[in-house]
From Swiss-Prot:
Sufficient for mitochondrial localization: region residues: 95-141
Membrane topology: Peripheral membrane protein
GO BP terms in the entry: dephosphorylation; peptidyl-threonine dephosphorylation; peptidyl-tyrosine dephosphorylation
Protein name: Dual specificity protein phosphatase 18
EC number: 3.1.3.16, 3.1.3.48
Taxon lineage: Eukaryota, Metazoa, Chordata, Craniata, Vertebrata
SMART domains, alphabetized: DSPc
Protein family per UniProt: Belongs to the protein-tyrosine phosphatase family. Non-receptor class dual specificity subfamily.
CDD domains: DUSP18_21 (cd14573)
Record keywords, A-Z: Cytoplasm, Hydrolase, Membrane, Mitochondrion, Mitochondrion inner membrane, Nucleus, Protein phosphatase
Function, in words: Can dephosphorylate single and diphosphorylated synthetic MAPK peptides, with preference for the phosphotyrosine and diphosphorylated forms over phosphothreonine. In vitro, dephosphorylates p-nitrophenyl phosphate (pNPP).
Compartment(s) where it occurs, according to its Swiss-Prot or TrEMBL record: Cytoplasm; Nucleus; Mitochondrion inner membrane
A cellular component term, taken from the record's GO annotations: mitochondrial inner membrane
Residue ranges of domain Tyrosine-protein phosphatase in the record: 19-160
Length: 204
């Protein structure tokens, strides 16, 4: 295993939202449209494309390996079933000097969640650090609440402790890193606009 930041050199290109976002020296995230752009794939030397969706069709290009992860972007979807096998596959591609593109429809939820699982397992990052790094490379990432619960469970499975937790909010359960922004979204005039975390109550 490598150290947490060894695969994340400062000379990486600036984060890209419409194109491919480089997460490590061998891992990229994108949306479905970018994943089917031959020029983007070749210019970034992608050798493996992992499609984490049921709605995006693959354009099969020669000399690229395709892996399908048929999961919908819904909190009840069991994306965690793929945490280990996909992390292992990304690592295997890197060991062969290849590069992996991980994508879903928007490059926001499903592919981001699998990226976080990979960083935890193979770069020994905490979930908090993995999220901070990935978000710095692709600012639009936002796994759904169900995927967050699965990632938190996976972090505990790997390390025996958690750096994040799910908390109650007027919008339902959310990871605690979203607590501040969710509190700011609640109208001041709403009587029930109090944000609860355990027994604590923060008034707006």
């Amino acid at each position: 295993m490598t150290s947490p930041w060894s695969a994340c050199p400062v000379q990486f290109p600036q984060p890209s939202i419409s194109g491919l976002s480089q997460i490590t020296k061998s891992l990229f995230i994108s949306n479905g449209a970018a994943a089917n752009d031959k020029l983007l794939l070749s210019s970034n030397q992608i050798t493996t494309v992992i499609n984490v969706s049921v709605e995006v069709a693959n354009t099969f290009y020669e000399d690229i390996q395709y892996v399908q992860v048929p999961v919908v972007d819904a909190p009840i979807a069991r994306l965690s079933d793929f945490f280990d096998p996909i992390a292992d596959h990304i690592h295997s591609v890197e060991m062969k000097q290849g590069r992996t593109l991980l994508h879903c429809a928007a490059g926001v939820s499903r592919s981001a969640a699998l990226c976080l699982a990979y960083l935890m397992k193979y770069h020994v990052m905490s979930l908090l650090d993995a999220h901070a790094w990935t978000k710095s490379r692709r600012p639009i990432i936002r796994p759904n609440s169900g995927f967050w619960e699965q990632l938190i469970h996976y972090e505990f499975q790997l390390f025996g402790k958690n750096t994040m937790q799910m908390v109650n909010s007027p919008m339902g359960l959310i990871p605690d890193i979203y607590e501040k922004e969710t509190r700011m979204m609640i109208p001041l005039s709403t009587p029930d606009g109090a944000f609860h975390k355990g027994k604590e109550k923060a008034l707006l």
